[in-house]
Amino acid sequence: LSPIPGPQARGAVEGIVPPAMLAGTSVPFPLRIRNLGSAPWPSAVPPGAPSAQTVCLLAAWWAPGVRHERALAAMSADLSILRDLSPGESYEQTVWVPVAETPGIYDFEIVVEQVDGARFDQPGNQPLRARVTVVSP
């Protein structure tokens, strides 16, 4: 496996984000994941195999106004894509997303990323984004 060159790393994550979620829980998200780039996405690896250069999803929670960098997220989680995707291909998958522990208003995002590789942050990428209220259970 190797890093996907930046201009070839384009993807979309589509789904419906509820406006409110319970703090500290995990929520199922039915998603449609699309490879909009010109490079295949290696995603499926055998159990115990290294994940370097595989393509996955990143779910993250930020306080409003905070720069969307993983290190600044109030909470983040890597989510596996269960199969490889060829250019132009889409795949529907439900992922379980951990919800932020502390109640409040958050910017929520699910993006495509490559482990130790492409950031999927160039124009043409379509992450799933929403403002969400996290409430006490």
Mark where each language-model region is:
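Short, hydrophobic/aromatic beta-strand segments
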Residues: A39-L58, D107
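Short, surface-exposed loop/turn segments at beta-strand-coil junctions that are enriched for proline
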Residues: W96-G104
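Short proline/glycine- and polar residue-rich coil/turn motifs
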Residues: S80-Y91
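Short, solvent-exposed loop/turn segments enriched in Ser/Thr/Gly
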Residues: G24-P30, I105-F108
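Beta-sandwich strand segments
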Residues: P42-S43, D116-P127
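Low-complexity, acidic Ser/Thr/Pro/Gly-rich terminal tails and inter-domain linkers that flank the onset
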Residues: L1-L22
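Asparagine-centered strand-capping/turn motif at beta-strand->loop junctions
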Residues: I33-G37
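Short beta-strand and strand-turn-strand segments in soluble, beta-rich domains
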Residues: G11, A60-I81
